[in-house]
Amino acid sequence: MAAQHRQTILGYLWLLLIPVIQTLLWVFLNSQKVINVGGTDIPYPAFVLTGTLLWQGFADALMTPLQQIQQSKQMLIKIHFPHEAIMLASMGQVLVNFGIRMILMLIVYLWYGVPLTTSLLLAPIGIVALIVLGMMFSLLLAPLSLLYGDVQKVLMVGLSIWFFITPVIYPIPTSGWAALVAKFNPV
């Protein structure tokens, strides 16, 4: 965990800085009417930050295990140890990073006075499901990733596209093709 932020000036702040900058960008674009998001149930900055943090949690759950497996490739070949340990370590890293980001989300919710509802109390179930989904995709792609270095690069492009077709920065569409895509989108 500490190795992830070694040799950086900002260290763990990078976990918070990126989603804050992305949120500020989307809020700016929405306020300038460059994009028109429409109404949300909670203040738009809290909405966008929530979506961004959840998306980053999913993307981390998908990419972190693949990166750690790739980095441990030689060790996997030479040393006999439970290979599941790499996946468990990466899952721990994803959960700790996500927990740190959730503290930011809680602060923003308190700042904007977002009321505590039963939906928010059930959110941890959805969050765990989201992280497990990312880890499952990662497990499925791990063998291919070890054979072909392109898998991670294709995933990065795919995640960028998937971000925009997932209701992260906009409410779930109620009609049209976007609604159909959102309906079948597992994220």
Question: What are the functions of these language-model segments?
Answer:
Residues 1-187:
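Hydrophobic transmembrane alpha-helices and immediately adjacent juxtamembrane helices
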